[in-house]
């Protein structure tokens, strides 16, 4: 009858002596942004016995590094694999290459000392100036250019509606608001149009939900966008997820164009989307999430030449051109600005991530109801944990002792309360 308390005592001793893995990351990760890949190295306090892998791709070949015996652990990730995402930026001008890397110190499990890092490299596009020498026999007209910074854009998923807070976690069916916003230092200068939106699970399964014109493809996933201002777009939606994945990665393109004076920004003309019209993209794991590395570098280096070439021409033209009205000069400057936007010059990428909780059994509750259920369940567990647990033998013993005590108490009360007999 004494074996159960002994086992419980042993369990308490084991839980008290359990300690975390005796290792951790020393300092910050060392990131090397190469021309074809990103290399991440970690310095550890003790010799490393574990794994370094891309989040969500533990079992994919080439996306995990198994290290052992050294105090340095690392991994090299090519641009065209392992869900390495590439996003274009107009301000600052260049390309962001990003991924999430996990360092795990246990050979089999994720423990409390493990860490996940969001790694990002920025490849800036350098500006090149093309000049030429001319001989002028008469008075020349100076040419002055003022550079207007491009807008800075972001993509957010808000809770409930346009005024909600950005969220990273949601339940299936929860109402959210997809919001695209561009901030500009000037007013009435630029127009923004959102298009080419996709959603993927981080493992190559990519579905297009907005086409190249900015029209919705599946009304159950996302409806046609609304444009409250020149540089803002949004639409309400409900949270969904892949069958066996909790993460969703949304990526869209935003086209920035010059706004014509006195006119409205052009918006996509879209018909009402049908249900189940989203297009699954074949082979999107590497091509969409991360474009070919060398092509990305060539794009960064070659674009400034095409953008800067028209600079020299106005100088020569201005020397020989007669005086023209100020309004005509303004129109010419506007045309020059538009011509400076070459192919893909005014297009940038925005990306956002959301984690979804799986569907609950029975009726599907809303987010507040789900929170209430979780709170109620925790209260029930706390109330249960304050009770007394007995084995069947212990319960029988407790019941027997209680019966004896109750019988003795009843006999005592009967003896005390009985009437006193009188002698005759």
From Swiss-Prot:
Report the subcellular localization. Answer: Cell membrane; Secreted
Keyword Secreted (UniProt): yes
sequence repeat segments run 302-305, 307-311, 312-315, 320-323
Q: Where in this chain does the record put each ZP domain?
A: 32-277
| PROSITE patterns referenced in this protein's UniProt entry, alphabetically | ZP_2
GO cellular component terms, alphabetically, are:
cuticular extracellular matrix; extracellular region; plasma membrane
Where does it mainly reside?
membrane
Which segments cross the bilayer? 393-413
Kindly report every residue range on the membrane side named Cytoplasmic. 414-424
Instruction: Give yes or no: UniProt keyword DNA-binding.
Output: no
- This protein's superkingdom? Eukaryota
Bilayer topology reads: Single-pass type I membrane protein
Spans within the Extracellular topological domain: 19-392
Instruction: Note the SS bond partners.
Output: 197-252
Query: What residue stretch is flagged as signal peptide?
Result: 1-18
Region (4 X 4 AA repeats of A-A-P-[AVI]) residue ranges read 302-323
Q: Upon deletion of the gene, what happens?
A: RNAi-mediated knockdown results in no alae in dauer stage larvae, which results in a wider lateral cuticle and larger body diameter.
InterPro entries, sorted: CUT_N (IPR056953), Cuticlin (IPR051962), ZP_dom (IPR001507)
SMART domains associated with the record: ZP (SM00241)
GO terms for molecular function, please? structural constituent of cuticle
Q: Which key words tag this protein in UniProt?
A: Cell membrane, Cuticle, Disulfide bond, Membrane, Repeat, Secreted, Signal, Transmembrane, Transmembrane helix
A Pfam family hit:
CUT_C
Q: What is known of its domains?
A: The small repeats A-A-P-[AVI] are also present in many proteins constituting the protective envelope of other species.
The task this protein performs is described as: Component of the cuticles, which contributes to the formation of extracellular envelopes protecting the organism from the environment. Plays a role in alae formation in dauer larvae.
Q: What is the protein name given in its UniProt record? A: Cuticlin-1
Origin organism is: Caenorhabditis elegans
The lineage is: Eukaryota, Metazoa, Ecdysozoa, Nematoda, Chromadorea
This protein's gene is called cut-1
